[in-house]
Curated annotation (Swiss-Prot):
One Pfam family, short name: Ribosomal_L4
UniProt key word Disulfide bond: no
Protein name listed in UniProt: Large ribosomal subunit protein uL4
UniProt keyword annotations, A-Z: Ribonucleoprotein, Ribosomal protein, RNA-binding, rRNA-binding
GO CC field: ribonucleoprotein complex; ribosome
The family this protein is said to belong to: Belongs to the universal ribosomal protein uL4 family.
A GO BP entry: translation
RNA-binding listed as a keyword: yes
Oligomer status and interactors: Part of the 50S ribosomal subunit.
């Protein structure tokens, strides 16, 4: 099978880029993609919240009022979990573990499913080469518009390009990634994906 290929001048090439059907021609598995995306986001999450237990809140052990005779409900101390300002029965802690386990084969299958759906929706294109001469954001914006793209673009390259990285760093809707660091969340989040021919080959090697 082939995917759309753009030459370095921004024009569609005469022939598309031949790709592996095993990587870019899979059926879309929505349940698996959901599992992969949720697991990736959960594994990137860090526990930053902390709440106080009954022992940790500021309190006194003095009984608020007598056990009997007042007509009010009995109360022991101000740190009770049902009191305003009291401790939490099951507090969140900074060492909370949010990680989700997902098998490597399932993860790769999920990424292949996403890539295949991007091809079907005509959201994934290949380009012969993608680079800028100097680290200038304006130059990159002009290059992206010259290729027919607007905001919301994920660029996959086969090797790190410092000029390209620095040029895209200040663009909130453009992300440049090396193919080896591609993740399911970025693939799903961006409306359009542009990959160099070298990046496509690297994806095929990684996901084979």
């Amino acid at each position: 099978m082939e995917i759309k290929l753009i030459d370095k001048n921004g024009r569609p090439a005469k022939a598309g880029l031949a790709v592996s059907e095993a990587t870019f021609g899979r059926e879309f598995n929505e349940a698996l993609v959901h599992q992969v995306v949720v697991a990736y986001q959960a594994n990137a999450r860090t526990a930053t919240r902390a709440q106080l237990t009954r022992a940790e809140v500021s309190h006194t052990t003095k009984k608020p009022w007598n056990q009997k005779g007042t007509g009010r409900a009995r109360a022991g101390m101000s740190s009770s979990t049902i009191w305003r300002g009291g401790g939490r029965a099951f507090p969140n802690t900074p060492d909370e573990n949010f990680s989700h386990k997902i098998n490597r084969k399932a993860y790769r299958a999920g990424v292949r499913s996403i890539l295949s759906e991007l091809v079907r929706q005509d959201r994934l294109s290949a380009v012969e080469e993608f680079a800028v001469d100097t680290p200038k954001t304006k130059q990159l914006v002009e290059k992206i518009k010259g290729l027919g793209y607007n905001e919301g673009l994920l660029v996959l390259v086969d090797k790190f390009d410092e000029n390209l990285y620095l040029s895209a760093r200040n663009l909130p809707h453009v992300l440049v990634l090396e193919a080896q660091y591609v993740d399911p969340v970025s693939l799903v989040r961006f409306p359009q994906v542009l990959a160099t021919a070298g990046a496509v080959k690297k994806l095929e090697e990684m996901l084979a």
